[in-house]
Curated annotation (Swiss-Prot):
The gene is slc16a12b. It catalyses: creatine(in) = creatine(out); guanidinoacetate(in) = guanidinoacetate(out). Functions as a transporter for creatine and as well for its precursor guanidinoacetate. Transport of creatine and GAA is independent of resting membrane potential and extracellular Na(+), Cl(-), or pH. Contributes to the process of creatine biosynthesis and distribution. The keyword Chloroplast does not apply. It is found in: Cell membrane; Basolateral cell membrane. The lineage of its organism: Eukaryota, Metazoa, Chordata, Craniata, Vertebrata. This is Monocarboxylate transporter 12-B. Residues 1-9, 434-477 are cytoplasmic. GO terms for biological process: creatine transmembrane transport; creatinine metabolic process. The keyword Cell membrane applies. Keywords: Cell membrane, Membrane, Transmembrane, Transmembrane helix.
């Protein structure tokens, strides 16, 4: 903690208004991630109305996810340069407009632009700044705070999935999208809660310290004092921007980034194809939507329990292992789903997959913060979610193409499972290599002769195999 205060100049309050930040981030995850998950419920309606196949409608979900992640650095940039409050309010307005315009769609291409691109852009401006604010307000209880905040995705899915299905049945898919547009407008209210930190240390300090980057900024003088030129200010801003992305040179972050790429390739497929798969094997519409609700509520348990557990002192240093375990188990669940062909058997899948999904989702910002530090968290999260963009874009259409080609969902769920397991194995392999390197380094250091002093002269001491003997050789200068 002392070291973090020295670097960043400030300490997070770990409570107080921070819990309002958690509440705001909770609603942001409901309005962004839960709504994105529920878009798959519209797929059957879109296929019937526009006479398109699986791969064509899957592009809608891909575009929402891809745009949300691809524009995540833009959300971080607006949050850093202006404020997180402005970013979230602007994003909420754009997302609401996108959903309302989607209710007037006349073609799938129209939905690609409104529901896919415009709504996804609004979600991007909201998601990253809100998550970063939680990390700024919390340190000791960071994992628990993130667990509560990210549980909004599961709670939202549990509530919205059957509600959206009922809205479609009573008001058609157009009316359901219009109502969702009004609901998502609550993001603007959440943005108003994201109050920047004002600390007493900054008021007492003659040179204010930037809470994100850790450097002192000298204010310009007004009465005849020296002022920096515009060119100097531009260079300073450029240097500060470069410093914000210094974490890209960290080897640990590069490995984590590779793992995220594999993770993103497989994690979205079950959410896209669980309901269509259930309908294909004969499960009713309400029961299929209820599977998403079960997945969502168990997601909450995974969010909070893993967040609370990894904040314990005995597990805090094993957060990476907990993350690897959750991702690996999620992959195993996907490998077994083609064997589950009734509602009774699909319920355990929703329970297990939802739990481990909630676990790793809550740990993504925590693990990222542990690797790059709090001062780089906002920019790092922008890059992390940016890495999800291309896999989110291509994996659902590839899954739909596999369904159209093979006539079954087996290959699609196998693709998801192997991608998730590979993500976990990458981190596990690097951890094993690091462990072996540390042991090898310890063994090599134990063999290096130690320098000791004997009667004022420097000598080399070699510990002999026989403990009763000591060999002392004068050191050569």
């Amino acid at each position: 903690m002392a070291q973090e205060k020295k670097k960043g100049g400030v300490l997070p309050p770990d409570g107080g208004w921070g819990w309002m930040i958690v509440a705001g981030c909770f609603v942001v995850t409901v309005c962004t991630r839960a709504v994105t998950r529920c878009i798959s419920i519209f797929f059957v309606e879109f296929q019937m109305h526009f006479a398109k196949d699986y791969s064509g409608t899957a592009w809608i979900h891909s575009l929402v996810d891809c745009t949300t992640m691809l524009c995540a650095p833009l959300g971080s940039l607006i949050g850093n340069q202006l404020s997180c409050r402005i970013a979230v309010i602007l994003g909420g307005f754009l997302a609401s407009v996108g959903l309302v315009l989607s209710s007037f769609a006349t073609s799938l291409e129209y939905l690609y632009a409104t529901l896919g691109l415009l709504t996804g852009l609004g979600f991007a401006l909201c998601y990253t700044p809100a998550i970063a604010m939680v990390g700024i307000y919390f340190c000791e209880r960071k994992a628990l705070a993130y667990g509560i905040a990210m549980s909004g995705s599961g709670i939202g899915t549990f509530i919205l999935a059957p509600v959206v299905q009922l809205l479609i049945e009573h008001y058609s898919w157009r009316g359901a999208l219009l109502i969702l547009g009004g609901f998502v407008l609550n993001l603007c209210v959440c943005g108003a809660l994201l109050r920047p930190i004002i600390l007493k240390e900054e008021e007492a300090c003659p040179l204010p310290v930037d809470s994100e980057c850790g450097y002192s900024v000298k204010p310009p003088t007004l009465n005849g004092g020296p002022t920096r030129s515009a060119a100097s200010d531009a260079k300073q801003r450029c240097f500060q921007s470069m410093q914000e992305y210094h974490f890209l040179l960290m080897p640990d972050f590069l490995v984590l980034a590779g793992s995220f790429l594999l993770l993103a390739s497989g994690c979205s497929l079950p959410f896209v194809y669980l309901v269509p798969y259930a309908l294909d094997v004969g499960v009713g519409h309400q029961h299929a939507a209820f599977l998403m609700s079960i997945l969502g509520v168990i997601d909450i348990v995974g969010n909070i329990t893993f967040g609370w557990l990894t904040d314990r002192r005995c597990l805090k240093k094993y957060r990476n292992i907990c993350y690897m375990f959750a991702v690996g188990m999620e992959g195993l669940c996907c490998l077994f789903i083609p064997l589950l062909r009734t509602f009774v058997w699909l319920v355990p899948f929703s329970v297990l997959y939802g739990y481990f999904d909630g676990a790793y989702v809550a740990l993504i910002p925590v693990v990222t913060s542990d690797v790059v530090g709090r001062q780089y968290l906002s920019s790092a999260l922008g890059v992390v979610y940016f890495l999800h963009a291309v896999p989110y874009l291509v994996s659902p259409p590839i899954g739909g193409w596999l369904v159209d080609t093979t006539g079954t969902y087996t290959a699609t769920f196998f693709l998801s499972g192997f991608a998730l397991i590979s993500s976990s194995l990458l981190l596990f392999s690097v951890a094993i290599i690091r462990y072996c390197q540390r042991n090898q380094k310890k063994n090599s250091l134990s063999k290096i002769p130690k320098l000791v002093s004997c009667e004022g002269k420097q000598v080399d001491y070699y510990p002999p195999k026989n403990k009763d003997l000591m060999l002392i050789i004068p050191a050569t200068s």
